[in-house]
């Protein structure tokens, strides 16, 4: 005999009402807390006297939304144009477009009350997990150990010794571009630059190319990275809001992709180990020090970071300078003439000889100014005791940064800041008032970009070889290529279609 339990209707109603009351109370408490927190942030917070838009001073959520939507660089640029060189961009964050702030935020610090040799990176922005340790987010002491181990591989001497590797991939790029030119189809230069830089850094880190140039396509590992930039912004944004558990619950595909990245990188790193520690590449120094203050996880995390930082940023700058030259035909003609008049053959274009192309180097600097590969501010957190930034006292716990996109386009520092004028870096009197020291595309201080020498070497050699071998004409569909691009730390670049015509000397 079976018995069926029937819940009386009044009891169901009572349960529902109780749940509703508690839910309403919870929502009311949350809303009340948010309102009180906003009132505190606007009227009582230690940063209350700094200018900025009201809603950004009241809540961090608007900063996070801009980050997730990829529009943060434009928003902060507009804030500085409206409010001045120091802007409160979140309840606890200040953005500086004062040249001295570069040194004060990112430089070496001696004799501080805190005793720290640098202002620490903001951990919520840089570390995905507690286990995620690399040269890019390591604490000060361990960062120094990792950087010293890497230093030789990134020195100018080592970069020149790696020229046969770098030059081989640039040779292959030119060959593949000639094939595209023969087909009469436009070349998507964003892809071709990415193929080249990923292949180069893959070889210099893992001892093996990604074969992007060979296959005229991205390796699946590279595609995983390229497809994850917005998801990474979402993850970081939720983490900053204290909601990283939501990212773990709602972004399983991203988590799976991260695991794939980790596992595949470990596999390649183990294969690289088999090549020994005398290859003269970027991670030779790390492998030599494994077990002597550096562990495998740190080598693994650093290797992943080197692949990203050593490929995407260089390819981005090359894409940007190509577009800016195409948009300025007189400048393109002048730099092309400089390159072609300096060399009698392709083989004369080397890492050493391209250093004499003053106008081309100025074009690269001007592209860095208008289209910095990392245009956002890289946040630091003020230590105990507070710090003076550009003569302004900032209390402990505050987040501070210098946004490259905004400071590079500030009319306070640059004549005609929105226009492409390489001459500003060559002593032209029209730009005598420009503060060229404001341009710091590789940052400053103990955590500046260790790959500066390699990046400059690659972009100089690649641009010179492209200009020497091809006449360039932009596809009309790409005339607004730069306008409104989204940025998730790195730019989300649309195709840059360029019609290539081999020059008579090389065809």
Swiss-Prot record:
Signal peptide: none annotated. Pathway: Secondary metabolite biosynthesis. Pfam families: p450. It comes from the Eukaryota. GO terms for molecular function: heme binding; iron ion binding; monooxygenase activity; oxidoreductase activity, acting on paired donors, with incorporation or reduction of molecular oxygen. The keyword Membrane applies. SUPFAM superfamilies: Cytochrome P450 (SSF48264). Belongs to the cytochrome P450 family. The chain crosses the membrane at residues 24-44. Disulfide bonds: none annotated. Heme binds at residue 449. It is a single-pass membrane protein. It is found in: Membrane. This is Cytochrome P450 monooxygenase tpeC. Its main location: membrane. Keywords: Heme, Iron, Membrane, Metal-binding, Monooxygenase, Oxidoreductase, Transmembrane, Transmembrane helix. Its EC number is 1.14.-.-.
């Amino acid at each position: 005999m079976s018995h069926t339990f029937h819940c009386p209707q009044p009891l169901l109603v009572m349960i529902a009402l109780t749940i509703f009351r508690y839910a309403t109370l919870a929502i009311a408490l949350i809303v009340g807390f948010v309102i009180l927190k906003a009132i505190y942030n606007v009227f009582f917070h230690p940063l209350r006297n700094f200018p900025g838009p009201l809603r950004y001073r009241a809540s961090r959520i608007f900063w996070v939304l801009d980050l997730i939507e990829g529009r943060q660089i434009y928003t902060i640029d507009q804030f500085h144009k409206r409010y001045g060189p120091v802007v409160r961009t979140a309840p606890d964050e200040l953005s500086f477009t004062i040249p001295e702030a570069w040194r004060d935020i990112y430089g070496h610090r001696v004799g501080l009350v805190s005793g720290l040799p640098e202002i620490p990176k903001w951990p919520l922005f840089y570390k995905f997990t507690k286990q995620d340790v690399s040269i890019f987010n390591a604490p000060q002491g361990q960062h120094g150990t990792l950087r010293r181990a890497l230093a030789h591989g990134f020195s100018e001497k080592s970069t020149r010794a790696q020229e046969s590797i770098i030059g081989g991939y640039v040779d292959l790029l030119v060959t593949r571009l000639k094939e595209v030119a023969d087909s009469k189809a436009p070349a998507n230069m964003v892809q071709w630059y990415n193929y080249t830089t990923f292949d180069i850094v893959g070889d210099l880190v893992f001892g093996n190319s990604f074969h992007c140039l060979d296959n005229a396509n991205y390796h699946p590992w590279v595609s995983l990275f390229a497809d994850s930039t917005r998801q990474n912004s979402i993850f970081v944004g939720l983490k900053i809001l204290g909601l990283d558990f939501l990212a773990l619950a709602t972004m399983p595909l991203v988590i799976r992709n991260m695991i794939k990245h980790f596992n595949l990188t470990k596999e390649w790193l183990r294969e690289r180990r088999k090549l020994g520690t005398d290859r003269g590449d970027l991670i030779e120094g790390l492998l030599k020090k494994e077990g002597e203050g550096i562990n495998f996880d740190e080598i693994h995390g650093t290797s992943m970071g080197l692949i990203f930082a050593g490929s995407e940023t260089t390819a981005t700058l090359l894409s940007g300078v190509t577009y800016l030259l195409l948009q300025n035909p007189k400048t393109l003609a002048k730099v092309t003439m400089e390159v072609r008049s300096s060399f009698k053959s392709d083989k004369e274009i080397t890492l050493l000889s391209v250093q004499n192309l003053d106008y081309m180097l100025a074009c690269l600097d001007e592209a860095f100014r208008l289209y910095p590969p990392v245009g956002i501010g890289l946040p630091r957190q003020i230590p105990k005791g507070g710090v003076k930034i550009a003569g302004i006292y900032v209390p402990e716990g505050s987040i501070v940064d210098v946004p490259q996109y905004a400071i590079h386009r500030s009319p306070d520092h640059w004549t005609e800041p929105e226009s492409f004028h390489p001459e500003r870096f060559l002593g032209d009197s029209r730009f005598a008032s420009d503060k060229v020291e404001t341009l710091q595309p590789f940052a400053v201080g103990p955590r500046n970009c260790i790959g500066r020498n390699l990046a400059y070497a690659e972009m100089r050699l690649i641009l010179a070889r492209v200009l020497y071998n091809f006449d360039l004409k932009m596809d009309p569909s790409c005339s607004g290529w730069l306008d409104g691009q989204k940025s998730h730390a790195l730019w989300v670049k649309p195709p840059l279609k360029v019609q290539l015509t081999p020059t008579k000397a090389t065809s």
